[in-house]
Amino acid sequence: MEKLLLGVLLLAFLPEGMTQKDLRGKVFIFPEQSDTAYVTLIPRVRKPLRSFTLCLKAFTDLTRPYSLFSYSTKSKDNELLLFVNKVGEYELHIGNTKVTFKVPRPPYGPVHLCVSWESVSGIAELWMNSRPVGRKGLRRGYTLGQDARIILGQEQDSFGGKFDAKQSFVGEIWDVSLWDHVVSLKNLCFTCYTSNILNWKALIYQAKGYVVVKPKL
């Protein structure tokens, strides 16, 4: 009953232009390089984050830098950013501070990425295709701001904007999930729809520019 009431309230107060959909089995396709194509995601709950787990799946053949997930506040453009600097080199930014994870032999094809971070220890953990990549430490004691713009397809150099086409994502993204706590990545189901901040089966979003929603291949 509580979940049903929450769903009704969310639908009643959706920002103008936003929609909520069950996107299971669907993907966002970003067909070409641009600084105008992106998807804005609205969290189901707005709260400061002292820990999180972020998971998503993506496919691209880009070899240049690109953004996978951009969470920006008015004080920190890279409050939370998952960024690929080059093939096999993944950057996690927390509060404008970054750590880099290197994958010796990155696979060609779709990747399933999960990253978690907790403020109490500052430890960030990255997994790729259900295998651990490593752990790094950053921003111990930090709290992510709650009033954020969350964007797929572009990297925010200012709050909600200042996009650079040369950092845009070209390809497909799906199954984006964000929790407000650390999930055991070792036991995380390959396709999991239990996340409480961003949930792919009840995603609130708005697509701008050349973005297409299609069934997953």
Swiss-Prot record:
Note describing how the cofactor binds: Binds 2 calcium ions per subunit.
Disulphide bond pairs: 55-114
Residues annotated as transmembrane: none
Similarity section: Belongs to the pentraxin family.
Annotated gene: MPTX
Keyword flag Secreted: yes
Domain of life: Eukaryota
Cofactors: Ca(2+)
Residue numbers binding Ca(2+) 2: 155, 157, 167
Record domain Pentraxin (PTX): where: 24-217
Binding site for Ca(2+) 1: 77-78, 155-157
Keyword Calcium recorded: yes
Subunit organization: Homopentamer. Pentraxin (or pentaxin) have a discoid arrangement of 5 non-covalently bound subunits.
Keywords, in A-Z order: Calcium, Disulfide bond, Metal-binding, Secreted, Signal
Matching InterPro entries: ConA-like_dom_sf, Pentaxin_CS, Pentraxin-related, Pentraxin_domain
Pfam families in UniProt: Pentaxin
Origin species: Bos taurus
Signal peptide as annotated in the record: 1-19
Compartment list: Secreted
GO cellular component: extracellular space
GO molecular function annotation: complement component C1q complex binding; metal ion binding
Name the record gives this protein: Mucosal pentraxin
GO biological process annotation, one example: innate immune response
